[in-house]
C-alpha cells in the first residue's frame, strides 16, 4: 500500500522535500513516506534524541536521503542546507517537545522552537521563496481553554456544549515556556505568509502516537505508558485521571501531510487543528 493511501490528487511527479527533525518520531515516518512516494528527501537533524540513529537506519531501508547533521539554531548551517538542497517543500518538524523540559531549561526551549523556526523562515525567504513551508505546531497555543464551560462525569470531562469544539480562530493563549515558544513560531509562520508572501501551512497537532515513538515520561505519553507497563514501572497520572486527549496514529498524520501538499493551496497561509 502506498504510504499516502487516500490522497485524491497528485499534482507533481517528484519534489525536493526538506524535513527538519527528519530522524525523529514523526520526521522519520514522514521522510520514509516521501521516499516511498518517489520524492527526493533531505533530512536536517541534530541526532540529539535517543533512537534517532535507529530511525535513520529504518529510513535507509526505503531509500537514501541527503542528511545534514546540525542544529536549526545555527543560522549559517540552516542557510547552507537551504541554499544547497533548494527544497520545493519544507516540513519543519524539529522541536523541543516537552513542557516539563521547557520549564527546566527555557532558553534551550526558546532557541530551538522560536529562533530555530525564525532561522528556517528566513532561509526559505532568502533561498526558496516559492517553497511550501509546513509547520508542525501544537494545541498548546490555545492555553488551558478555561473560557469554555465543562462538565465532569464519573469517567471524563466534556464540554458543556457537546458541539463546542475548538476552532482555528480560537484566540491564542500561550501557557508554559513551551506554549510560548511554539506559539511564537506559529505566529511567525503565518505572519511570514502575510508579510513576505511565503506559502505556509500550520498544523496544530495534539497527541500523536505510533511506530518508532521512543516515549519518555516527559513526552510521548502513550508510548511511555506502554513501555512502563512492559517494564513494570509505575505510571504517574496528574489530576484526577478524567482528562481527555485527542490521540492520532502516525500513519493518519502522514496521510494528512500528503493531503496538505496535494490539495489546492489558493491561500498563501492555512491553519488546521489536527485532532484524533
Ranges and model annotations:
Residues 47, 241-244:
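Short donor-sugar binding/catalytic loops of nucleotide-sugar-dependent glycosyltransferases
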Residues 1-208, 251-254:
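N-terminal Rossmann-like NAD(P)+-binding domain of SDR-like oxidoreductases, especially those catalyzing
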Amino acid at each position: 500500500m502506498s504510504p499516502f493511501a487516500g490522497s485524491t490528487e497528485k499534482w507533481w511527479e517528484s519534489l525536493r522535500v526538506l524535513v527538519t527533525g527528519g530522524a525523529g518520531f514523526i520526521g522519520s515516518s514522514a521522510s520514509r513516506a516521501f521516499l516511498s512516494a518517489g520524492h527526493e528527501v533531505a533530512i536536517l537533524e541534530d541526532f540529539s534524541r535517543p533512537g534517532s540513529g535507529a530511525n535513520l537506519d529504518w529510513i535507509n531501508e526505503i531509500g537514501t536521503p541527503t542528511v545534514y547533521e546540525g542544529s536549526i539554531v545555527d543560522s549559517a548551517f540552516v542557510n547552507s542546507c537551504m541554499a544547497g538542497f533548494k527544497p520545493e517543500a519544507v516540513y519543519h518538524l524539529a522541536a523541543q517537545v516537552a513542557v516539563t523540559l521547557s520549564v527546566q531549561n527555557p532558553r534551550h526551549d526558546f532557541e530551538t522552537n522560536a529562533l530555530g523556526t525564525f532561522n528556517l523562515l528566513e532561509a526559505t525567504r532568502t533561498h526558496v521563496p516559492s517553497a511550501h513551508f509546513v509547520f508542525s505546531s501544537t494545541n498548546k497555543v490555545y492555553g488551558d481553554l478555561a473560557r469554555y464551560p465543562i462538565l465532569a462525569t464519573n469517567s471524563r470531562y466534556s464540554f458543556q456544549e457537546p458541539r463546542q469544539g475548538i476552532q482555528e480562530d480560537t484566540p491564542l493563549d500561550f501557557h508554559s515556556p513551551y506554549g510560548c515558544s511554539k506559539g511564537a513560531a506559529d505566529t511567525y509562520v503565518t505572519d511570514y505568509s502575510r508579510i513576505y508572501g511565503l506559502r505556509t501551512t500550520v498544523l496544530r497537532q495534539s497527541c500523536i502516537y505510533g511506530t518508532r515513538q521512543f516515549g519518555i515520561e516527559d513526552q510521548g505519553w502513550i508510548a511511555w505508558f506502554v513501555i512502563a507497563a512492559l517494564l513494570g514501572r509505575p505510571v504517574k497520572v496528574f489530576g484526577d485521571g478524567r482528562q481527555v486527549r485527542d490521540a492520532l496514529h502516525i500513519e493518519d498524520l502522514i496521510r494528512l501531510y500528503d493531503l496538505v501538499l496535494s490539495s489546492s493551496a489558493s491561500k498563501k497561509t492555512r491553519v488546521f487543528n489536527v485532532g484524533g
